[in-house]
Amino acid sequence: MKRQLLLCLAIISFLSNSGIAQKAKIAAADKKYNSYAYIDAIQTYERLAEKGYQSVEMFEKLGNAYYFNSDFEKAAQSYEKLYQLQSELAPEYYYRYAQSLKATGKEKEAATILAKFENKSSDDSRSKRLKNNTDYLEDIKANVGIYTIENAGINSKYSDYGSTIVDNKLIFTSARDTGGVGQRKHAWTGEHFTNLYAAGVNGELIPSNPVRYDANVNSKFHEATPVFTKDGNTMYFTRNNYLDGKKGKDANKVTLLKIYKATLVNNRWTNVTELPFNSNNFSTAHPALSPDEQTLYF
């Protein structure tokens, strides 16, 4: 009898400790998620799921973490588990689930989920666009072949985007690792912070080997999406809220994005300043100039 009692107490103690450990792991993952460290959060959520833990909140966050990193296949899998646990979801989860399904080629399944999104959010502008253009996929297919898209030959396995041409150079954004001291990774994506790169282009606009762009512009945080005036002497670009060695944060201690301006002097970019409409409390990003250079869109 005494042995049985001890065994029962041992089992209760084990289950109690396991529950406490599980709650601690969930709390740690949630903390990572709430600070946008999605890659770390994903690893913990996945380990919990592998051990059989399931909750609506966890699969909401796991799906979002994949969705915000454009891993739509795994996002769809997570949202599917969420949908199995609770078929009545907030409209945004129907939308993200449908977009993830669509991105993985499951158009019929996506249409079913989108219908639920439309029913729950008839006033949403996305819902209205879907209702007004139900055959948008057919429109896209009808235009296939109008343009020829080729790999530029300078892409890496990381994010490469936000390109423009100035002075026979292709200037673009990349998260590639080209070495150097202090290489840092972004907790959101698990990739290196993006910098600007330059690749010479020939008469056929074929780029050559890219190199890191001007050190006065690139910092230890994100730089992206440059745009230049026609004379090539002024550049507008996106950067994390960081200038002169000082990092700005919003009320939640998050470093957002701002648009900066730089001036070319003696072939070096100088006078990096932020534009006056920036704020610590919201992001401004991805500038574009009108043809007459009188208006900056962002």
Segments from the language model and where they lie:
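Alpha-helical segment of the N-proximal tetratricopeptide repeat
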Residues: 22-47, 51-52
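Start-of-helix register in tetratricopeptide repeats
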Residues: 23, 57, 91-92
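Short, conserved micro-motifs composed of acidic
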Residues: 103, 107-109, 116-298
